[in-house]
Swiss-Prot record:
Belongs to the ABC transporter superfamily. PROSITE patterns: ABC_TRANSPORTER_2. It comes from the Archaea. This is Probable branched-chain amino acid transport ATP-binding protein LivF. One of its GO terms (biological process) is branched-chain amino acid transport. Residues 2-234 form the ABC transporter domain. Disulfide bonds: none annotated.
Length: 237
């Protein structure tokens, strides 16, 4: 689905990613793990066009989209959800869902909203509430639901369970699995709870100092000695 080749990127003159090569497989969950400051979130931002790319390629559907701006990537059915959630606080939940389908015709938007509400029934009783009044979990449900309305093919999630209770975080993980299994979404995940994220994933990458330290199936990463050291809080990764 997405192939990253020799990617070097950062912010202005500050380079964060160095010679990154990765393959995000279609219809799979791929999790990126690593210590704080290793470039995980920057990797997602770079794929969506929010950083400066010095060199390298991002191949999507046989085209290099490295220089394509974010609004065009959204039209290409690539969705990026930062930790802060992409919701409009002054609009209702229902209005947010409708806006998410702005590039679709009216009948298609209605159909996609019904699909989103089937995955996130928690939103049904709060459709008339302003998004700014929602809890953290409700905002996350809304942001992910908006991606479904948009009919996204690729969904990039940056720490979707941050500041949520363990119980609610598990609900989010279950929703991610459902979006892959029932709708074939390609999902790229950065998550604080790296172990749990890998447990629901197909593949994974570990970043250290802006480089891919190792990659493999989720099971291979979970059993890798370096990941075990990282999980135990050992800094010498």
């Amino acid at each position: 689905m997405i192939k990253v080749k020799n990617l070097n990127a950062g912010y202005g003159k500050l380079q964060i990613l160095f010679d990154v090569n990765a393959k995000i497989e279609k219809g799979k969950i791929t999790t990126v793990v690593g210590p704080n400051g290793s470039g995980k979130s920057t990797f997602l931002k770079t794929l969506f066009g929010l950083t400066k790319i010095y060199s390298g390629e991002i191949i999507f559907k046989d085209k290099d989209i490295a220089k394509v701006p974010p609004h065009q990537k959204a039209r290409m059915k690539i969705a990026y959800l930062p930790q802060t959630n992409n919701v409009f606080a002054n609009l209702t939940v229902e209005e947010n869902l409708k806006i998410a389908g702005y590039v679709l015709d009216k009948d298609k938007v209605k159909e996609r909203i019904e699909i989103a509400l089937s995955v996130f029934p928690e939103l049904k009783d709060i459709l008339k509430r302003k998004a700014g009044t929602l809890s953290g979990g409700q905002r996350q449900f809304l942001a992910m639901g908006m991606a479904l309305v948009r009919d996204a093919e690729v969904l990039m999630l940056d720490e979707p369970t941050a500041q949520l209770s363990p119980k609610l975080a598990e609900v989010i993980f279950e929703k991610i699995i459902e979006m892959r299994d029932n709708f074939g979404l390609t999902i790229l995940l950065v998550e604080q709870n790296a172990k749990r994220a890998l447990e629901i994933s197909d593949n994974g990458y570990m970043f250290v100092s802006g480089r891919v330290a190792f990659e493999g199936t989720a099971e291979e990463l979970l059993n890798h000695e370096k990941f075990k050291e990282y999980s135990l809080g050992i800094t010498a990764v």
